[in-house]
């Protein structure tokens, strides 16, 4: 496995940790790659081929083994960024469920990320995805004069 595939495999495992691929999870994963070098430079065909390869790997190995193999192919800095991507993907649809928390804890161990660093990363996404109560003086349904 090359480092490009390995990095994507970590995110793919995060959105499919429970064996389900939701539309929102898949879209979030694709979005996470589409705005990151070198993935944003890939053609649609290359991106589809990568996603197909990841799906085949996931089916053949399972999420755990796929993550183990991916971790061997990434530098420490790449592992940190891959963990951050996984954390954001899992946090973006609401607070971490206990099973998601266990998955991320396990992922941190596999990637060699300390509990302190993992908590620091997760705290950022807790803030980033916090529920906000906002008010506005803007008219939500403006009346447009004829």
Where do the model's predicted regions map?
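Small-residue-enriched hydrophobic alpha-helices in membranes
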Residues: 1-146
């Amino acid at each position: 496995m090359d480092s490009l595939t390995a990095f994507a495999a970590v995110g793919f495992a995060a959105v499919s940790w429970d064996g389900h691929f939701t539309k929102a999870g898949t879209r979030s994963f694709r979005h996470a790659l589409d705005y990151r070098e070198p993935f944003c430079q890939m053609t649609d065909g290359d991106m589809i081929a990568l996603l197909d390869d990841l799906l085949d790997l996931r089916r053949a190995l399972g999420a755990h083994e796929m993550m183990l193999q991916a971790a061997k192919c990434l530098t420490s800095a790449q592992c940190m960024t891959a963990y951050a991507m996984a954390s954001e993907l899992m946090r973006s649809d609401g607070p971490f469920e206990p099973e998601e928390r266990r998955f991320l804890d396990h992922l941190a161990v596999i990637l060699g990320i300390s509990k302190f660093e993992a908590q620091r990363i997760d705290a950022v996404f807790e803030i980033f995805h916090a529920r906000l109560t906002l008010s506005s003086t803007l008219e939500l349904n403006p009346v447009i004069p004829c």
